[in-house]
Amino acid sequence: MNREDNTSVYSNQSSIHDDLFKLVRKHMTSTWQEPTPPHDCEAMRDIVALLKAHNGPLILDSFCGTGMSTAKLASQHPKALVIGIDKSADRLRRHVQTPSHNYHLIRGNCEHIWAQLVAANIDCEQHYLLYPNPWPKKAHLKRRIHGHPSFPLLMQLGGAIEVRSNWKIYVDEFAAAAQLLGLDTQVKSLSATDPLTLFERKYAANNENLWVCRAATA
């Protein structure tokens, strides 16, 4: 197993996965058709109701965990409706409420909610994917966001995408996959002076290298 300098991620993968481009091209030529669970349909109805009651743009915070980042993004974008999505009720229950009133936490599977938003022609202005599970084993490429068949939905949702990780290979892969979708991408090192998430705070405190990929339509 290889350990990249200044990261707690251990992996048997030392560069962009050999199968990445083939896998992304396969997903670009097909439509993800996994049935949507009833609770994700209910989550979508909640989001639609929130959008109807709000006049500002939509910002998504997918895989939001405890929602710390959702609240921080809401304070940074007071005119936007910021929706944090996570499948874990336990993580969402640990959210510490803030004075901002323009954000909501939704329990649901992000991929199914993305698909429903696209089907409803609902666009987002910005989309944050902050420290998702990196699935660092080489055999787990298909479990990463950019290796999942729902990945093309991110482009269809529109807006600027921001992915953060403490594993550079992850953001390099995401950038390469996003370029296949026709997005402009930029990968940079990140200085977390005001951490958005609990993970970011932990990694910064441990002096780990942090990376960000920003992607948007050309």
Question: What does each model-identified segment do?
Answer:
Residues F63-G67:
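Class I SAM-dependent methyltransferase "Motif I" SAM/SAH-binding loop
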Residues S88:
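Conserved SAM/SAH-binding beta-strand->alpha-helix loop
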Residues S62, I85:
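Conserved beta-strand/loop positions that form the S-adenosyl-L-methionine
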Residues G158-S165:
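Conserved beta-strand signature within the Rossmann-like core of class I S-adenosyl-L-methionine
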